[in-house]
């Protein structure tokens, strides 16, 4: 049973990531003028967004690098978590890449609080949230222009499939 749950979670995550890649490839993004305000992007989700597995900030560094390689440099990754740094680096093919590590990823989180899992929806919209001089719900505090959402893996791992679509729709509609 445990192996089946892990396999299903892996397939779901792969499907979501492949779907996101296809969508990104279909969207034509024009480079933003340096004179305009940076586009605020919030990577939001569970441990996959947090970068927990390798402890290396996960997919976010590759996302930032791909934007830069496509001429999109006027963006700001926003969120309450930054893995203890305002900038981060990684080495790729002998090149040191610098990227913005800010995000709203939380290891172990489900779409909504369910069982012993904390819920992303409750955390994001918690009006008692305080981080330094930023307070209020995260959407108001950071005002992202773009949200990248990767959530639901822990719902699948815990076999909390009943209502998963409704929970996700409720989060997205907020």
Task: Give a label for each model feature.
Residues 6-21:
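Sec-dependent N-terminal signal peptides
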Residues 168-173:
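Generic structural signal for well-ordered alpha-helices
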């Amino acid at each position: 049973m445990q192996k089946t749950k892990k396999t299903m979670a892996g397939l779901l995550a792969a499907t979501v990531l492949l779907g996101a890649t296809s969508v990104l490839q279909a969207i034509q993004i024009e480079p933003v003028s340096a004179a305009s305000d940076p586009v605020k992007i919030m990577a939001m989700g569970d441990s996959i967004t947090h970068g927990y597995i390798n402890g290396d900030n996960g997919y976010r560094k590759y996302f930032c690098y791909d934007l830069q390689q496509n001429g999109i440099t006027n963006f700001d990754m926003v969120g309450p978590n930054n893995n203890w740094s305002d900038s981060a680096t990684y080495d790729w093919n002998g090149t040191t890449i610098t990227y913005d590590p800010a995000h709203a990823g939380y290891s172990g989180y489900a779409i909504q609080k369910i069982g012993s899992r904390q819920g992303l929806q409750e955390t994001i919209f918690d009006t008692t949230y305080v981080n330094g001089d930023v307070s209020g719900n995260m959407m108001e505090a950071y005002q992202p222009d773009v949200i990248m959402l990767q959530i639901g893996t822990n719902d699948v791992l815990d076999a909390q499939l009943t209502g998963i679509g409704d929970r996700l729709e409720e989060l997205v509609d907020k």
